Amino acid sequence: MSESISHQLQLIRRGCQELLIEEEFAQKLAQGRPLRVKAGFDPTAPDLHLGHTVLLNKLRQLQDLGHHILFLIGDFTGMIGDPSGKSATRPPLTREQITQNADTYASQVFKILKPEQTEVVFNSSWMDKFSAADVIRLAATYTVARMLERDDFSKRYHENRPIAIHEFLYPLVQGYDSVALKADLELGGTDQKFNLLVGRELQKHYGQPPQCILTMPLLEGLDGIQKMSKSLNNYVGINESPAEIFGKLMSVSDTLMWRYIELLSFESLETVRQWQNEVESGCNPREIKMRFAREIVARFHSQTDAVRAAEEFEARFSKGVIPDDIPEKKLYIQDAGLALPQLLKLAGLTASTSEALRMIEQGGVKLNGDKVSDKTRIIPSNVTVIAQIGKRKFAKVTLVTEQSGKQAN
C-alpha cells in the first residue's frame, strides 16, 4: 500500500465507527480517481444541528482529499419515513412539507461542503419513474427474514407491535439510490448500517462494484447521555447566534468536550494530542473548551463573531455583566400584574410553570440582576424587567395591560 493511500486511510478513519470493507476501499483509492461518495438526508427537519455535521465534516474531509460528494436529499424516501431505530411506525411527510424542508438544506450544508465538489441530487428523480412492477421486482431482491435481521424490526416483531409493509421498502429504496448513483462509498450513522449494507447487496444484484461503507457515531447531546436531537432540546443548531453556540458548547462536561473535539473539530490529531497533554500538565480544561467553541462559531459565522462571543461569554459569566443582545418579549395581560412563574413560561425561559417554580426554588432565577426566591412574586403591568434563568437564558420582558381582553401570549 502506498504512503499516499495509507495517509488517506488514516485521515478517513478518524472519528469513524466502522469502515467496510477496508481492503476494497484501499483498492478503490488506488485507482487514482475521485471516488463517488454518497450520503443521504431525509428532509424531515429543516434545521441542522452539530449532530448532523459529524457526517458533513467527514464528507468535507473526503472533498479535501479530492473526492466527489453526492449529497442525496431523500425527497421520495421522506414520504415513507425512515424506521431505523424507531419503536413505532413513523408518519410520512407530504410532498409539500418535504419540498419546503429540502429548500433549507443548501444554505446550511455549504457552510461546510465545497459547492464545486458537491452534487445535490433528489431520489425522486429516479424513483418517481418506477412503476408498480419495478417496485415489486425491487422488493423481490430481499426476503422478510433478511429484513427481520434488523434490530428495530426484530424487536417490534417479537413484541407483537405492527410493522407496515411500506417500512420494508425504505432500506430497499435507499439501497437502490446507490445503484442509481453508482456510489463507491456511502456514509451514514451507526443506526443506518443495515440500510447501507442493503445498498451494497443491491449493487451486486445489478452488476455494479459494491460500495464500501463508512459509519459515523451518533453525537451525544449537551446532556452527554442521549443523542443530539431537537426534540430532546439537547442540541446546538448551526444557525443559532454566535453567543448561543458558544455558551452551549462551554456548558458541556470536560469529558464530553473531548468527544466533541474528536468528532467536530478540524484541528489535526497532533494539535488535539497537544491539548490533552496541556490538560494533563495542569491546564484548565475550560481553556481548551474556549478554543474549541471559538472554532465552531467561526465555522458557522465568522472569526470576528467568534472573538466577540468569547468576550461576551467572559463578561457575562466571569464578571456578571448582562449581555446587550437580549431577546425582547412583550406580554399582554388582563390583570394588574403577572405571577413570576407564568412570566418565565410565557417569555420562553422555561417550558412550564412547574419548571419555573423549580428554578426559583433552586435559586436560578434573577430579575434585573437580583436573585429572586419568592415564588409568589407578582410583576406589575406596564413595566419592563430583565429575566434570567441560570447563566445563559435572558429575556427583556415588558408587561402591557390589554384593554381588549386579549390573554397573555
From Swiss-Prot:
Q: Where does ATP bind?
A: K230
Q: Name one Pfam family in it.
A: tRNA-synt_1b
Q: Which domain of life is it from?
A: Bacteria
Localization per record: Cytoplasm
Return one Gene Ontology term, BP aspect.
Answer: tyrosyl-tRNA aminoacylation
Domain S4 RNA-binding residue range list: 338-399
Spell out the protein name for this chain. Tyrosine--tRNA ligase
Q: Which PROSITE patterns match?
A: AA_TRNA_LIGASE_I, S4
- Taxonomically, what lineage is the organism? Bacteria, Pseudomonadati, Pseudomonadota, Betaproteobacteria, Nitrosomonadales
Q: What class of enzyme is it?
A: ligase
**Catalysed reaction, written as an equation:** tRNA(Tyr) + L-tyrosine + ATP = L-tyrosyl-tRNA(Tyr) + AMP + diphosphate + H(+)
What are the entry keywords? Answer: Aminoacyl-tRNA synthetase, ATP-binding, Cytoplasm, Ligase, Nucleotide-binding, Protein biosynthesis, RNA-binding
- Enzyme Commission identifier(s): 6.1.1.1
Q: Where are the transmembrane segments?
A: none
Keyword Cytoplasm on this protein?
yes
What family does the entry list? Answer: Belongs to the class-I aminoacyl-tRNA synthetase family. TyrS type 2 subfamily.
**In chain numbering, where does the motif 'KMSKS' region fall?**
227-231
NCBIfam families with a match to the protein in the record = tyrS (TIGR00234)
* Motif, 'HIGH' region: chain positions: 43-52
